[in-house]
């Protein structure tokens, strides 16, 4: 038994070390094809650039986390760098929010108190607006700036356009979610949407109310045509995302029914060639290399907005 514990400890340490060696991305800036980060300064020929702002996910609802994203998570966004649409070249800006803390903090998730003040999501929306205005001041046309995001970053994207519809050209939400594994934890597949959400409300009434508040705001105010990707096996909001179809102009793409796209098995790739993992969670399907099958859909959407 001791030998087993020793083996597991060494195995975990080895994996942690390999990932820590440049795998995680901890700072803002423009990304290169080789995942190098360059600080925002002067943008060469800004009128002929398309800027995609990447909003990462979160490890908790309202608190800090150790890093903002990682190579495997952002690889597909990086694959769009230098693509040209109508003579305009795509750039990718990684926007880190890992140090932002909501007014009620990390412990609120375990509380039944109604949320008071600005949540981390609210502050991330403001952070995006500040960056958009900075890019515009550097000469990038507003219509050529796109707010995008995965998970909590995807929900940030939807909230951004419900509050600031004219500030950017468009947005892409990947697996929007920020309220835990609703689909899986509350057995939506077995019990149905209504019963699943009722159980969520019973267990976490304050969190249920804030999610409902955000969803209602988006349904009421979002008028900008956006692109959204979801997957039915996403344990977070995979089976609780049909409300997106009620939004006029929303193009929702249900990626697939399993862990393949166009008949190909899906893998995530890290920094090294050996960092190759099968996708076993629908929440990560937009991060698997097979998802690049949808790059033409993304490029077509961007082209329709500039």
Predicted features and spans:
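Active-site-adjacent alpha-helix of alpha/beta-hydrolase-fold enzymes
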Residues: 69-81, 230-273
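C-terminal catalytic histidine-bearing segment of alpha/beta-hydrolase fold enzymes
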Residues: 251-306
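Primarily recognizes the serine-hydrolase "nucleophile elbow" in alpha/beta-hydrolase
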Residues: 134-136, 143-191
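The feature captures the conserved acid-bearing segment of alpha/beta-hydrolase catalytic domains
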Residues: 178-255
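Alpha/beta-hydrolase active-site loop
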Residues: 112-138
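N-terminal cap/lid segment of alpha/beta-hydrolase-fold proteins
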Residues: 21-45
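Short, surface-exposed "cap/lid" segments of acyl-processing enzymes
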Residues: 43-85
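Cap/lid segment of the alpha/beta-hydrolase catalytic domain
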Residues: 92-122
């Amino acid at each position: 038994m001791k030998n087993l514990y020793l083996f597991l400890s060494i195995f975990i340490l080895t994996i942690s070390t390999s990932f820590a060696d440049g795998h995680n991305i901890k700072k803002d800036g423009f990304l290169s094809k080789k995942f190098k980060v360059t600080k925002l300064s002067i943008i060469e020929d800004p009128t002929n650039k398309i800027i995609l702002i990447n909003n990462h996910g979160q490890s908790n609802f309202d608190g800090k986390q150790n890093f903002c994203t990682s190579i495997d998570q952002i690889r597909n966004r990086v694959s769009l760098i230098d693509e040209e649409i109508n003579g305009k070249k795509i750039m990718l800006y990684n926007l880190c929010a890992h140090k932002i803390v909501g007014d009620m903090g990390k412990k609120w998730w375990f509380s039944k108190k109604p949320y008071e003040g600005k949540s981390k999501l609210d502050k991330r929306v403001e952070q995006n607006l500040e960056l958009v205005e900075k890019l515009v001041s550097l000469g990038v046309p507003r219509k050529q700036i796109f707010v995008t995001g995965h998970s909590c970053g995807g929900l940030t994207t939807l909230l951004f356009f419900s509050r600031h519809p004219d500030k950017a050209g468009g947005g892409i939400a990947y697996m929007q979610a920020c309220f835990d594994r609703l689909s899986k934890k509350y057995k939506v597949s077995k019990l149905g949407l209504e019963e699943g959400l009722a159980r969520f409300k019973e267990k976490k009434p304050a969190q249920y109310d804030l999610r409902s508040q955000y969803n209602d705001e988006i349904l009421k105010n979002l008028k900008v045509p956006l692109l959204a990707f979801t997957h039915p096996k996403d344990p977070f909001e995979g089976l609780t995302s049909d409300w997106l179809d009620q939004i006029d102009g929303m193009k929702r793409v249900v990626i697939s029914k399993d862990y393949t796209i166009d008949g190909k098995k899906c893998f995530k790739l890290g920094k090294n060639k050996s960092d190759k993992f099968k996708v076993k969670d629908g929440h990560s399907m937009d991060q698997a290399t097979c998802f690049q099958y949808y790059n033409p859909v993304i490029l077509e959407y961007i082209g329709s907005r500039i």
